[in-house]
């Protein structure tokens, strides 16, 4: 009876949690680690693929990569088989781990969230492969975020510089082309005039030939 009532309470809490936080991954990305703190982070094995993550990354990983399996598994923290959503169980029953994990500060989403993901996926800072060498335009609304983070500006600036360099090269090349086109206009008009005169002569010759042919035919018939 006690276990059934506990399961009912946990299931009810899970539903309330899902209604309150529709996107849990975004919620976890809403915290940034304070720079300069490199203390040991406790890691837990994913109960579905055995990869190791810290507590926040584990919840994001389960929520994104194992959404269908998350309702039946063994909790990596307390080693108890859970019959409800695993992420909800961890966040509700082991909330103290989140507090002890690290001091964190709330932040807004946007480019900072994207930067955190890029840092996790590309720890060596090689972000250029994401853009495939294509040009990138940085909007004015995100310029303050770029300036605030030197790592973000380090990989956006070369791309933006390449874009403006290419644009300047194109404008420099189109200038002489326009001048050449303007210079060629009189020559083209002269060619058109000469061609029209030749066409007129050809038409006159053809009309004379037709008249001669008709006149000869009429004369032959009269004879």
Curated annotation (Swiss-Prot):
Keywords for the protein's UniProt record, in alphabetical order: Nucleus, Phosphoprotein
Localisation per UniProt entry: Nucleus
Protein's UniProt keywords contain Flavoprotein: no
Induction: By drought stress, but not by abscisic acid.
GO biological process: positive regulation of DNA-templated transcription; response to abscisic acid; response to salt stress; response to water deprivation
PTM-bearing positions, type Phosphothreonine: 114
InterPro entries: DI19, Di19_C, Di19_Zn-bd
Family recorded in the similarity comment: Belongs to the Di19 family.
Protein name, per record: Protein DEHYDRATION-INDUCED 19 homolog 3
Organism: Arabidopsis thaliana
Lineage: Eukaryota, Viridiplantae, Streptophyta, Embryophyta, Tracheophyta
Gene coding for it: DI19-3
